[in-house]
């Protein structure tokens, strides 16, 4: 099974979740709020791969996205390498800098990925707009 999550920046808004079996038939479709609910459904479905539509890493050199923190990106371009590669191809993407407006989404995605990986799940970051 494959499991996809269109994650929202806050549990106050529902995240769309979809599980596909190996024949690509819908095995699960739902809208979930809390990360715990998402994790519980994933643990019932036991997918081979979990795809999350949210940035799951920070730019190299950053430990956080807080402007008050002295951490700095290693590159003068500030965004992640994958974001720069997309932009080179003319594909826009949300910034992953300290001034980003999707800070909550990034933090939530990273926390969810960490929890799922600790449980032994295979998690990947996806960006459907780019495909």
Feature-to-residue mapping (PLM):
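Phosphate- and other anionic-substrate recognition elements at nucleic-acid/protein interfaces
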Residues: 1-131
């Amino acid at each position: 099974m494959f499991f996809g999550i269109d994650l929202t920046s806050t549990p106050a808004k529902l995240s769309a979740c979809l599980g596909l079996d190996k024949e690509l038939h819908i095995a699960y479709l739902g809208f979930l709020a809390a990360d715990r609910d998402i994790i519980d459904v994933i643990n019932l479905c036991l997918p081979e791969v979990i795809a999350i539509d949210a940035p799951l890493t920070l730019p190299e050199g950053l430990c956080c996205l807080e402007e008050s923190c002295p951490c700095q990106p290693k590159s003068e371009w500030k965004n992640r390498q994958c974001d720069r590669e997309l932009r080179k191809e003319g594909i826009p993407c949300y910034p992953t800098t300290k001034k980003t407006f999707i800070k909550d989404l990034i933090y939530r995605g990273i926390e969810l990925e960490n929890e799922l990986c600790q449980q032994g799940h295979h998690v990947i970051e996806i960006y459907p707009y780019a495909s």
